[in-house]
């Protein structure tokens, strides 16, 4: 984590002079109006340590308080997901879009509140409710990867009760530019200094139903 974050921080600051970088190990203190890189050098650290092969590198650029540009790279499959607001979403140079599957035929990704087990009971309730009404559950434990997969139609639903800014900053622009819907709950803008709950879906109808379940 430390070596990759140091490498990315150096490259990104050179790419955009004056920008700040935050991640799991960074010390920059951002404020409103800053151009800010939000990075996760190894999203899915436990997967990486155990050689499961599901980890990614995630880089997001936050502009005016919102994720504006995002890159998610999956080295095990040499897959580069990327998007810039207003310019579409891509996977290895090919335009991508969310799937058109309805709720009953959707797959849900959720990591079961890995960071705080106190939230496990409500997570179980929500996941079970969604699982009963959808097609299947996929819990690989790599937030940025799962969100990027939604953008290219591999999954349709995402819910996590507590993740950190660097887990989602890179993937949010990719989902939105691919036609999907994503929302950070209980927040007016993208939080930079605290964890948050997040939901996402491939369609407006699926998003509305998922949010209804989560908010009950």
Regions found by a protein language model. Give the residues of each.
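Short secondary-structure boundary/capping segments
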Residues: 13, 27-29, 72, 97-101, ...
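Short loop segments at secondary-structure junctions
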Residues: 62-66, 76, 85-88, 94, ...
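Short loop/edge segments at beta-strand edges and connector loops
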Residues: 23-25, 93, 141
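An extended, acidic
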Residues: 98-216
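Generic detector of well-ordered alpha-helical packing
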Residues: 2, 25, 41-44, 75, ...
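Residue-level signal for inorganic ion chemistry
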Residues: 1, 12, 45, 74, ...
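N-terminal subdomain of lithium-sensitive/metallo-dependent phosphomonoesterases centered on the IMPase/IPPase/PAP
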Residues: 1-42, 205
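DPxDG-like acidic metal-binding loop motif
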Residues: 31-90
């Amino acid at each position: 984590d430390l070596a990759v974050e140091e490498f990315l921080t150096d490259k990104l600051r050179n790419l955009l002079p004056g920008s700040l970088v935050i991640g799991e190990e960074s010390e920059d203190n951002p404020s409103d109006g800053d151009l800010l890189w939000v990075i996760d050098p190894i999203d899915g650290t436990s997967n990486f340590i155990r050689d499961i092969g599901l980890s990614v590198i995630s880089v997001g650029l936050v502009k005016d308080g919102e994720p504006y540009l995002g890159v998610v790279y999956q080295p095990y499959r040499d897959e580069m997901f990327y998007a810039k607001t207003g310019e579409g979403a891509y996977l290895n140079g090919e335009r991508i879009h969310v799937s058109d599957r309805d709720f009953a035929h959707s797959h849900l990704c959720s990591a079961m509140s890995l960071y705080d087990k106190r939230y496990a009971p409500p997570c179980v309730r929500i996941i079970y409710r969604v699982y009963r009404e959808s097609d299947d559950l996929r819990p690989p434990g790599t937030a940025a990867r799962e969100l990027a997969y939604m953008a290219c139609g591999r999954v349709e639903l995402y819910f996590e009760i507590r993740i950190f800014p660097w887990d989602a900053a890179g993937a949010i622009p990719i989902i939105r530019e691919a036609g999907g819907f994503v929302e950070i709950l209980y927040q007016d803008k993208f939080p930079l200094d605290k964890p948050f709950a997040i939901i996402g879906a491939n369609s407006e109808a699926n998003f509305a139903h998922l949010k209804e379940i989560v908010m009950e």
